[in-house]
Amino acid sequence: MGLFTVTKKATTPFEGQKPGTSGLRKKVTVFQQPHYLQNFVQSTFNALPADQVKGATIVVSGDGRYFSKDAVQIITKMAAANGVRRVWVGQNSLMSTPAVSAVIRERIGADGSKATGAFILTASHNPGGPTEDFGIKYNMGNGGPAPESVTDKIFSNTTTISEYLISEDLPDVDISVVGVTSFSGPEGPFDVDVFDSSVNYIKLMKTIFDFEAIKKLLTSPKFTFCYDALHGVAGAYAKHIFVEELGADESSLLNCVPKEDFGGGHPDPNLTYAKELVERMGLGKSSSNVEPPEFGAAADGDADRNMILGKRFFVTPSDSVAIIAANAVQSIPYFASGLKGVARSMPTSAALDVVAKNLNLKFFEVPTGWKFFGNLMDAGMCSICGEESFGTGSDHIREKDGIWAVLAWLSIIAFKNKDNLGGDKLVTVEDIVRQHWATYGRHYYTRYDYENVDAGAAKELMANLVSMQSSLSDVNKLIKEIRSDVSEVVAADEFEYKDPVDGSVSKHQGIRYLFGDGSRLVFRLSGTGSVGATIRVYIEQYEKDSSKTGRDSQEALAPLVDVALKLSKMQEYTGRSAPTVIT
């Protein structure tokens, strides 16, 4: 048992350490500045109640991106100095964001300890590497992201910090080896517990899904499957779950070795960045003679996001959460007794609203940011939720969960084919989606992202959209000049949300233009990029007529896209003639 001491280090504040919707994200080179990470970590410890630090157990892990291993050692030494009793670390510092949430909620240490929170080292879907992005966020005892009351306190602390505590003589712990290393300091014993987090996570998944039913599907010669981890942390779970537990062929796994730079790619599961999977599923530009798999899915860097694909078919995230909600009770044992409610983020399409109305479920529309769903779940008001940015989840944890979404889809496909695995033709992903549209109508939906836009120009564009809302007659006049074939705007506002659980109000959550036929235009500035601003434009049109639900999405939305770009003066403000990404 090694002895360590505590050192007080003098420091000065850094500007801009304000945690966004998912923590603090900056370039690696910013985090590598002396004292930068330490200031943020100490500001977090200082923002927490004393009993969540002194004598407490905290988790420190992440998606394995570049600088994670250094950060784990720094945070561990600071935890020891601040009186933390135990630090739990995923082997090789790898733990998906949903697995961290599960570990906080479910894991009990050998000595009966439970975690009170976690430092998660991730910048999610942002690229990794020496010149790319790093991030850190703090999750609370419920397994969910710190609420604004805590992140505001953290930020306030970063502006006044003058010293931090660190145990510099605490040796680095070998995080590649599972086991407990014990030390002793001024306040008593301190343990570092390195463990394989996939064990806890798989155990939890088995309480939710019928693994035998999914295994029958995955081992059926008729069903083919492909999972792409984009070299993110999902790779640390994929083989255990899909191959060892569910019987899929190992060749069905793509890019499932976690890498510090995600193999030089962009670990964002969408049609632009998951190129290899998109090609394999028959959605790429090159035409291949190889028959695509029946089902494909991808994850982002920290495995909380998912993309679902059928053979030559893309499932929008907005449709995905609606379809899971519509089929959950019959297909997923965890939901067999019914859903408590459903929720979506404001920019997500209203497909879930229609399901909720038809099934008589409680429904909530919340700002972007998973913590808003967490409040509803803690209050027992919501079972399934999702957002258009490829995040889907349920109340089994307090984060979105990419592998959960894949298992949910496999459960639905297995249920639809339970008497059909020996038949001529399987019910496919495309069949399930088209049947859903026939029942509930279709929400044609697209998102245009303009990344790394000049922040000043982005703010001006948004301010102009707000000022236009004061006269809808002028807006409608303008729209008719752009396109005469779109409905009238009947309401326009800046979305604000009053939390039904704690009464807190979140303002300025996105600009909305709502049309008489149920169509919507939404404009948001994103808080998850590390440089410049990202403008996101969400364009949605509802079609109830089942004979018109089979059109190409971009073609169906062309009039509204035209209106959105001209109404916002996108090119004029940003200088961009096209978006960076279209989803």
From Swiss-Prot:
Its main location: cytoplasm. The keyword Cytoplasm applies. Transmembrane segments: none annotated. The active site is at residue 124. The keyword Membrane does not apply. Keywords: Carbohydrate metabolism, Cytoplasm, Glucose metabolism, Isomerase, Magnesium, Metal-binding, Phosphoprotein. Its EC number is 5.4.2.2. Mg(2+) binds at residues 124, 300, 302, 304. Gene3D superfamilies: Alpha-D-Glucose-1,6-Bisphosphate, subunit A, domain 3 (3.40.120.10), Alpha-D-phosphohexomutase, C-terminal domain (3.30.310.50). Binds 1 Mg(2+) ion per subunit. Belongs to the phosphohexose mutase family. This is Phosphoglucomutase, cytoplasmic 2. It comes from Zea mays (Maize).
